[in-house]
Amino acid sequence: MNSICLNFRVHLPYYYKKYHFFDIGVNHDYYDTLRCESEVKRVSERCYLPANKLMMTLLERYPERFSFSLAISGTAVELLESYAPEVLESFKELVSTGRVELLATPYHHSLASLQSSDEFKCQINLHREKMKEVFGLNTTTFANTEMVYADYIGVILSELGFKGVLTEGAKHVLGWRSPNYVYSNPIAQNLKILFRNQSLSDDIALRFTNSYWTGYPLTAEKFADWIIRDPNHRSITLA
């Protein structure tokens, strides 16, 4: 039986105001709250609400065959709490089915893993606490910002108790190996590594609407056929 591991990532940033020289030391209100609210509501109406509705339909239609993982940044949760609580509720409903795994991620969607291990650990712990507070779940799998990964990051994750990590299936890293298998960190071998299938993921994320692409238009049937024809299609991670 072939398995397809679906991962969706949700991040919303805070937007800053135009901050003038003469505001320094006088005005400490840095965020553009009107823009934050507008952007959150726009993406909620155009993306999150319809997508979550579709996901719930699929979960109900295929109770034994469909599940997925979800990585939501801490700032995304904060902004949804403030400006689109109905969206956060829809995420909670998905998670409550028991077939949506929450992944840990840096709280602020930062690249702390490349600069400071202490800050990296701090943001991971903050995020885990937020997921426990909002969704009532403990996270055991990690997805770094932009799927950045190195063996030393894997060691940190293992020390924090993670069982798995999701990362980019970069060709210069994998070489002749297929991304469609589960690997282990060579130092912390209890940490399992899932590599994103770069080609198939980008077919959906980047090339789907490109009318000049040789695979256009991409249909569900065509995509499924590509997966079946892949000689190394045991476990394909799409993110």
What does each of the following model-derived ranges do?
Residues 68, 72-146, 189-209, 237-239:
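Metal-dependent polysaccharide deacetylase catalytic core of the NodB/CE4 family, i.e.
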Residues 125-181:
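Catalytic domains of cell-wall/extracellular-matrix polysaccharide-remodeling enzymes
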Residues 48-67, 93-100, 133-137, 229-233:
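A structural motif corresponding to the C-terminal end of an alpha-helix
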Residues 2, 11, 35-45, 190-239:
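Catalytic grooves of carbohydrate-active enzymes
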Residues 47-58, 90, 123-131, 149, ...:
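Alpha-helical packing segments of well-folded alpha/beta enzyme cores
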Residues 16-19, 79-84, 114-116, 150-158, ...:
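A short acidic (Asp/Glu
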Residues 1-63:
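N-terminal regions that are enriched for targeting/export leaders
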Residues 53-54, 82-95, 174-188, 218-227:
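Alpha-helical scaffolding within the catalytic cores
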